[in-house]
Structures are given as structure tokens and as C-alpha cells.
Design a protein with these regions (language model features):
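Extended, hydrophilic extramembrane loops/domains of integral membrane proteins
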Residues: 1-17
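Membrane interface segments of multi-pass transport proteins and intramembrane proteases
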Residues: 30-37, 68-84, 163-173, 192-202, ...
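Hydrophobic alpha-helical transmembrane segments
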Residues: 83-87, 150, 173-177
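Juxtamembrane "helix exit" motif at the C-terminal ends of alpha-helical transmembrane segments
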Residues: 11, 52-77, 152-174, 180-183, ...
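Alpha-helical transmembrane segments of polytopic integral membrane proteins
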Residues: 8, 60-64, 68, 93-103, ...
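Polar-ligand-bearing catalytic/cofactor-coordination segments
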Residues: 79, 83-90, 95-147, 192-196, ...
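Hydrophobic alpha-helical segments characteristic of transmembrane helices
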Residues: 12, 19, 23-102
Length: 246
């Protein structure tokens, strides 16, 4: 994901001063400059990824754990504390999404997110991929990453209920070790939700679809056109519709 963002950012034109500097360089100097920029880009990418992981773990796993621990003095049940931890985690997650959605740039990203969902829903419902059909399609989708993250939060409550050790350090270590397992179970649920369309699956998918009302916004026609171009660059949707008989 970071590599794709960096690649996208590379298409922004340099300012006039930068252009003049590069034009004045010899071929060897230009090559050395490009190598330097690549190294800086890799370092920036590594630092960003590392910070993102630490930030996410701190905000969504460690902070709820320590906040729920405050109630140990008044609540003796480990089960209730674990449930409280899960509720705090959900509240932080929803609050975080609500907060970042107030910024203009993120709101615009969410509009593109909505355009992406609309394009996929348009194809999966057997319609021609054009602006008019995409516009009237739903901006919510069962296989969305937002649904995945919410399911991770919910399933983690169940898994963490079974951590019954006294050491707080060991409790944190076990939580970290369970993250890949929780992510795997959540991924399989998302796949199941995308494959089947029955009442039980639809009910279980509702929380994720509700969250998508926050992480997707109605796109304008230009954004829809970008979404269509992106889909067509990735796969042959007409061939897919024929193969799937949709």
C-alpha cells in the first residue's frame, strides 16, 4: 500500500526551481540524485510503516487494556473486565473514524472509497459499468476493509475472554500473539459473507455495513469515472460477468 502511495505521489510535478536544478545536472549527477531519492523514499516508507504499526497497537490494543484495568478495583470479574476492554476498544475505533472523517482530505478519500464500492456493486449486480449505473449502486459492500476491522474488534473480545493468566506482561504478550489468529478468523468471515447471501450472514454483516456509512461518502461523477478507470485497469469485468453468469 505504501509503495503504491509513493508511486502515485511521484506523478506530482516538481516546482520550477527543482526542474531547473535537474536540468542543470549532468547525467551522472542526475543518476546519483535519483539513487539518493530512492533511498530516502525507502527510509520514509519503513519509518511510516513502523510508526503506523506501533500507533495502531498502542491505540487499539494496549490503551483499551490499560483503561479497562482501572476498573479492577471495583470489578472483580475477569470476564466483565475483558468485555469492558472490548467495548472501550470499539468506542476508540469508532471515535477515531468519526474524528478523522471531519478532515477535508480524509472526507475526499472516503468519497473515492464510496466510488470503489459502487463500481464493484454495479458489476456484481450484472450491470454495465458506466457512470449512471454506478451512481445508483450502493456504496456499502460486505467485503470492505472497514467491515474486516470491525470484525477484528468484535472477535478479539471473544478470544481475549479466554486469556486467564495473572501476569500483566503475559496478558499483553498473549494478546499480541493472538492478533494474527484473530485477523485470520476475521478474514475467513469476510470471505464467507461475500460468498453467501442468507439471513444469518446478512445479520452478522450489518455492523460492518453500518460502519461503512462513516468510511464511505457519496462520490461525484468525476470520482466515479476514476473508480471505473481503476476497475477496468485491474480486470476484465465483462469477462467476469459472463463467467459468473451475473
Amino acid at each position: 500500500g505504501m509503495q503504491t502511495l509513493m508511486y502515485s505521489a511521484s506523478f506530482f510535478e516538481d516546482d520550477e526551481d527543482e526542474k531547473k536544478k535537474k536540468e542543470a545536472m549532468t547525467q551522472e549527477e542526475r543518476k546519483a540524485q535519483e539513487e539518493k531519492e530512492k533511498k530516502q523514499e525507502k527510509a520514509m516508507m519503513g519509518g511510516t510503516v513502523a510508526f503506523s504499526i506501533v500507533f495502531a497497537l498502542g491505540l487499539f490494543f494496549f490503551l483499551p487494556y490499560f483503561l479497562s484495568g482501572i476498573f479492577h478495583k471495583v470489578i472483580s470479574s475477569d470476564t466483565v473486565i475483558a468485555l469492558l476492554e472490548g467495548l472501550i476498544r470499539l468506542a476508540i475505533f469508532i471515535g477515531y473514524i468519526a474524528l478523522i472523517s471531519l478532515t477535508p482530505d480524509i472526507k475526499r478519500v472516503f468519497m473515492y472509497h464510496g466510488a470503489e464500492h459502487k463500481c464493484i456493486n454495479c458489476i456484481e449486480h450484472g450491470m454495465e459499468l458506466n457512470v449512471e449505473n454506478v451512481r445508483k449502486s450502493s456504496r456499502q459492500h460486505k467485503r470492505c476493509g472497514t467491515s474486516f476491522l470491525l470484525i477484528v474488534m468484535l472477535i478479539s473480545i471473544v478470544f481475549f475472554l479466554f486469556i486467564r493468566v495473572d501476569s500483566r506482561i503475559l496478558q499483553l504478550v498473549l494478546r499480541l500473539l493472538l492478533i494474527p489468529v484473530i485477523a485470520g478468523v476475521s478474514y475467513e468471515f469476510i470471505r464467507l459473507a461475500g460468498r453467501y447471501d442468507n439471513r444469518l450472514v446478512n445479520i452478522l454483516s450489518k455492523p460492518g455495513l453500518w460502519m461503512q456509512k462513516m468510511t464511505t461518502k457519496e462520490p461525484d461523477d468525476e470520482m466515479i469515472e476514476v473508480g471505473i478507470a481503476s476497475v477496468e485497469a485491474v480486470f476484465d469485468w465483462r469477462k467476469w460477468q459472463k463467467e459468473e453468469n451475473v
